Amino acid sequence: MLKEYIEKGGQRLRLGYTTGSCAAAAAKAAVLMLFTGQEVRHVRLMTPRGIELILDIGEIRMQKRTGESSSLFSCEDIEGSCKNGKTVNKPPFYSAVSCGVRKDSGDDPDITNGALICATAALSDRPGIRIDGGEGVGRVTKPGLDQPVGSAAINSTPRRMIETAVREAMEAAEACGEYGLEVTISVPRGRELAAQTFNPKLGIRGGISILGTSGIVEPMSDQALLDTIRTEISVRHSEGMTILAAAPGNYGKNFFLEKYDFSIETAVTASNFIYDTVQMASEAGFTRMFFVGHIGKLVKVAGGIKNTHSQYGDHRMEILGQIAEETAGSREAVPLTLKQELSDCVSTDEAIRILKKYSLDKQVLHEMTNRIQLVMEGWTKGKMRVEVIVFSNVFGELGKTAKAEAWISELRYETGRRGGSPAGGEPGSWKQGWEI
């Protein structure tokens, strides 16, 4: 168990390690056993973050070589770069060795926590180290991801970690010479786990991804979630989508399905990172974004708030009160206590009831929706047009901008063109975890 901690929100949270670290450690152990014939129960792995891991190795399986001996011979017999005449094993003791490492996500709510990540190291007639995915590791079917179409969903950093670990193992085992190795990463429950991740939506089929840029899982990492959002945006752009649909979460997608009988399965899940999502969409080359969200989050955007998480402040009622005051003007029917009444509200639905009481709901919500649009477009300095729909779970659709309906028609067409489901289907899924 990794005993490294961070302080976040007044809590002491334990770090974990990524699927990439597990794969690299398993590969290192498998190669050590392949060339030494000795069981390996623990390996050391230095992560890109600079934290050294000592990981337990299990599920060891060895396949013996047939018809060959494991004789020892001198380094002088090898054309290559062995160390000063040391005696080395040739040929290797086994033709293939597989083993596994259990993923430990620390205090992070990760789908893959406890999953067994396996590596099989096998001799090959071709020189070099080749890394591929086996059962339970996804296969890339769409452009725009870290790996090209057809490749195993083992991202760049884990691939480098695996190759480095394999070379370290060969050096430690004094395995000199031109050995070819096939390293296959597999996850026994990967196909089942993948159904609970974003992978099906991203076009990664058949299993989970092997992820991580630092080798370490940081509980509730903002950066990991931002990386996922950026990846989703990149995939949508590569698919040729001209309008990027986005929503803070599944509430928005579910509302859209119920209201318009249309599943925006291509919608990027922005979570609380509204500003970052808008910026990344613009940077990716999108010039149009369609955003649907609950008033509880989007009213904050109307006030210019970039991250809608409560840790950055609430301000919902203050913003609604300001808009109501500016919209109502000097109407006699509106009491001077309106802002205070709104300020006393606990929920936005309660605030809407107050606005309805004074027949201000339509005006205020219309103005709020337009301000959301203006703020989002302002974030891109006019490089991207944004259409918005705001809803409430109690009151339904509260407001939409001028061209929202027209863009919905375009989204229907684009979703149908890419082979999606314009109606029905699951509106979204959860990400694999906050691996960074």
PLM feature segments, named:
Residues 2-6, 14, 202, 208, ...:
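A structural signal for small-residue-enriched, beta-sheet-centric alpha/beta enzyme cores
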Residues 192, 253, 395-397:
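Flexible, glycine-rich phosphate/dinucleotide-binding loops
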Residues 65, 427, 432:
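Cationic, low-complexity basic patches in intrinsically disordered or flexible, solvent-exposed regions
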Residues 369-420, 430-436:
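Extended hydrophobic packing segments that form well-structured cores
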